[in-house]
């Protein structure tokens, strides 16, 4: 994901919901963790370098 696309995120959340309905909780959690990591990485790339506080290092 190079840029935030709300429609794409909504589609991926819908896929996770389908996986949950099917009863495959492990895969659903794994997919959510991947989505979270991608979104956090994207935010980190778009945020200017701000010095971290000691508890974030």
Curated annotation (Swiss-Prot):
Entry's transmembrane regions: none
Pfam families reported for this sequence: YciZ (PF23675)
Highest taxon of source: Bacteria
Family: Belongs to the UPF0509 family.
NCBIfam families: PRK13658.1
HAMAP family referenced in this protein's UniProt entry, alphabetically: UPF0509 (MF_01641)
Protein name as annotated: UPF0509 protein YciZ
Gene source species: Shigella flexneri
Gene assigned in the entry: yciZ
